[in-house]
Each structure stands twice: as C-alpha cells, then as structure tokens.
Amino acid sequence: MCGFPKKLLISLHFLSKRSESPIFAGMKTLSLLFFLGCFGITFKSNAQLKPIYSQADYAFWLHLPADSILKAKPPVLIFLHGKSLSGTDLTRVKRYGVISEIEKGRKIPAVVVAPQTSNGWDPVKVMSVLSFVKKNFDVDTNRVYVVGMSMGGYGTLNFAGKYPEHVAAAVALCGGGNIKDGCNLATVPLWIQHGTLDQAVPISESEKIVRAIQNCNGGENLKYTALKGADHGDLEKMFRADELYTWLFQFTKEVQE
C-alpha cells in the first residue's frame, strides 16, 4: 500500500478514531491528504481543484478550500450540471456553474464536488460521491447543499427527495421533480427558480413539484421564484450571484450518521 510502514498505518488508523479535538481534527486532515496523495489525488496548501476518477460512481471535480477552512469542518456543496455538459470529458463541467465560478476567482468556503453524468442523474450515484467526501475529509455533515440547473435541477430535487435527511438546503434552477417526492422535499429548505419564457423545460415542470410540496406542509420551507421574461439560459446567471450561496449556507440540518 504505497510502501507505508506498518507503524505509520497503525498510527493513522488510530488518529482517525480519536476524539475530534482541534489538534486531532487537524492531524486527521493531514493524514487523509497523505493517503489521497498516494492515489494521485494531491493538493497544495491553498485552495485547489482536482479531477477525481474511479473513487465513486461518477467522475467528479473536487475543490478543497484553503487549509484554514478545511481544518474547521467546512460544509459540502454538490453541483449537478445540465444535459449540455454531459459526457465523459470532465472539462465540459467547467463551462458554467459552480466550478466555472471558482475558476473565475469566486471563493466558496466549502468542499465542492461537481460530478459528471452521461445519461441523467442517479441519486444513488450522487450519494457515492458524497460518501467519498465524508469518508476522506472532516466535513460538517449537517451542512450538505445541492444546486443544479436544467437536468441538474431535476437531479437536485431527485437527490433531495430520496435523501432529505442528508440535505440541509438545495437550489433547483429550471428543472422539475417527481411529485411523489413532494412530502420528502417539503422537509428540505428549497429555492426553486424558473423562467416564465423557458421553452427547453417549461415552467409547468417546476410548478408541478411546487404544488406537490405545498400540498404537504403549505410550502413552509419553500422559496419559489418565477422569473418573468427569462428563458432557459438566463438562469445560468444565478451561479454568479452572491445571493445563491448566502441563501444556501444559512441552513443546517442535524444528521444522524
């Protein structure tokens, strides 16, 4: 196993089981980064973006914030892309959305993952990406957020609908969802947005899931925005808005691991 001395392996395993004091949390982070480096997943001391392959059911981009944030149990932000970014070339995922904004200089105080699918989003496979992050980094599991656009908007609501107990909040842009998930989604703070002139995905797709949520609890955790005169592509600008990230990061959810 990368030529690790047996005593070092025992030591690292021991550290991972110790109480999460600030000292041990920091040592755990260093140990995990050491292991990741063994598999070719290496990072410098500052915020870094790295493609990850063969570690989950999807290949994905992994963004680690600066060390000072990483050592303080950062939240997790999952970005699910739309159909135009589908395929097996991860560079496509940089065309718009959260990863694009990071590359333009946006500082996001979270571990960010942006998986790529070639044929629609499977919430179980998305969960495998989240599981990788939870296993390898000392993140705040009470602050897991999901955001997606178009097909990624559907993926966001499908993931939150299947795993509502794991999602602190989610934003779905010009997508839709399964009305059977309405009552599960009603327990998650959601911001659903759709343009009134969207011809690629009609606004009725969002309206259906909004009604399903409202029928469960009146939509007490729901924020719905119908953007008058906006078409499908107009929603991309939300990734450039501070408001999106500020809204998401205000929420927490107690997760029973």
Q: For the regions a protein language model found, what residue spans apply to each?
A:
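Active-site machinery of serine-nucleophile hydrolases
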Residues: 76, 80-125
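C-terminal catalytic histidine-bearing segment of alpha/beta-hydrolase fold enzymes
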Residues: 181, 199-200, 204-257
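A domain-start/cap signature at the N-terminus of enzymes
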Residues: 2, 8-9, 22, 43-76, ...
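Primarily recognizes the serine-hydrolase "nucleophile elbow" in alpha/beta-hydrolase
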Residues: 143-184
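Gly/Ser-rich "nucleophile elbow"/oxyanion-hole loop immediately N-terminal to the catalytic nucleophile
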Residues: 67-72, 121-150
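Short beta-strand/loop motif that positions the catalytic acidic residue
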Residues: 192-194, 198
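Sec-dependent N-terminal signal peptides
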Residues: 30-39
